[in-house]
């Protein structure tokens, strides 16, 4: 609490240019620190430290982008409407970067099968132990350098902003195996 008060006070008296320079420095330092680490190491640390916040009773929380209704609601409405328009046998969904499954859980009723994929092994172990639905399964995989599961529809939601352009290119090169791909 005291640290927060000090930060607010410093922001109030520091020149705006100094604040921008500080934020550029922090981003560069974080990028440099993460450039020699695997995505598994980076994202495992994010969950372990609660960088995206903490959920109600869950040990894993993917942040407000996955839990805020005004953000998630329109996405779930659009994807579920699309899934309902398909024959049931064509609703095999692969969710790359499934995170804490808070969004995927809302789409599950419209899927003939759902495979959630994430690079964090502990998250995948947790989901496989906690989610007991016959159509849901979770797989640990590196979507950049690893194999992707088979399916009809691929969802990539709020993943690419965390990857470099080269990493995004590697993922995009693998997506032709899916009939439909939604990238948001």
What are these regions (language model features)?
Residues 159:
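Hydrophobic adenine-recognition pocket in adenosine-nucleotide-binding enzymes
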Residues 177-184:
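Conserved beta-strand signature within the Rossmann-like core of class I S-adenosyl-L-methionine
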